[in-house]
Amino acid sequence: VAYKLNEEKKNTTDEEQTNVVKEDDIGKEIKLGIAEFDTMNPLLSKNKQVQEITKIIYEPLFQLTSDYKLEKCLAKDWAKTAENKYLIKIDTSIKWSDGNNLSVDDVIFTIENLSKIDSIYLENIRHITEINRVDDNTIRLILDQEVPFFEYNLIFPILSKKNYEGQDFIYGSSNNAP
């Protein structure tokens, strides 16, 4: 998390003001007004408010633009190599809020755990039968059949594997905070 959202600034003049975040404040805290939350894990949450809020915390491999075009987010590049095979390069220069770099292990971890839980994103990965690490920044997805525009399914949030190490994915303490 790279924003401090709890400061409210009042505009006492007619001039437009910008909210400047000081470097010392980055990553300190977020205060959210939610009636009730079930979990802060975006893959597990059934709460629409939590799902919307976690969109500013977690990012997907791809995202949709306002005109519904696919745009790279955590993915650096991708290619459909056969009717049912995709290669995806991850942008490993992206850092998590703890300073660790995004890795293919995070993507594999997310997809593997997503396949084991009841999630709003389960349908997105239903056709993935294999996920292989090609190298430090590339994964191969193999599907059980050709799925037209499959890359549009890769819009679910990616989680940090290191953040969940040694914990139960569903009940671990990492689900209590972003």
What would you call each of these model-derived segments?
Residues 1-6:
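Sec-dependent N-terminal signal peptides of Gram-positive bacterial secreted proteins and lipoproteins
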Residues 7-39, 52-55:
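N-terminal, intrinsically disordered, polar/charged segments of Gram-positive cell-envelope systems
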Residues 33-81, 112, 176-178:
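N-terminal lobe/hinge region of extracytoplasmic solute-binding protein
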Residues 37-39, 68, 94-95, 146-149:
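Solvent-exposed loop/turn segments at secondary-structure junctions
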Residues 77-118, 134, 140:
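Aromatic- and charge-enriched surface segment that lines or borders ligand/interaction sites
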Residues 98-101, 149-154:
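Solvent-exposed, non-transmembrane alpha-helical starts
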Residues 154-178:
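Gly/Pro-rich hinge or "lid" segments in bacterial periplasmic/extracellular proteins
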